[in-house]
């Protein structure tokens, strides 16, 4: 309630980039409070529903953006990712959610008390083609953190990648889907290696402390 109806006084660097591309901003979409969770159930607006099945969540924290794109209301929506907030909603809603390299798009103005900015600014769309077109355009916008331009992506790259496949703790259906995707990539000549990444609950506790500090 403390931030209900709060209107930003200025555009972030990334929003300025978006406006410079000519995209039209239709408004805000729902997120969980301060983007802290992987589902979108804001206390003010109530839970956001998955367009494919209203009994399910669209994921989070960019769940409102993903729901708008998946339902066809918009073709592209802003999302950002510090711990899955682009990738989780994209997965839940059957969308393309690419977490770009930090600095590929403009970094937002973070909290002054935090020494690092862990957010990656991006979008969710319904196709790889739309996502590629967005990044081709956005990388031409002014950005003091800009990386060397990639340009228009019209075909698969020739380089073969080394890809680690991690399915620790995954639901069986999710694990099978990931393994199927890995098989497809292996068929394209990429090297796939299944690995295990031990995860300590302390990591999650530390992350929530960091993220909560960023919120203020």
Q: For each predicted feature, which ranges?
A:
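N-terminal, positively charged, Ser/Thr/Ala/Gly-biased leader segments
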Residues: 1-6
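Short glycine/serine-rich loop segments
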Residues: 10-12, 16-135
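General small-molecule cofactor/ligand-binding pocket signal
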Residues: 26, 191-196
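Charged, often glycine-rich, active-site loop that binds/positions anionic groups
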Residues: 42, 46, 205-216
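Short glycine-biased active-site loop of nucleotidyltransferases that positions the nucleotide triphosphate
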Residues: 87-90, 154-157, 208-211
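A short helix-breaking turn/cap at a secondary-structure junction
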Residues: 99-180, 199
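Short helix-loop-beta junction
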Residues: 178-190
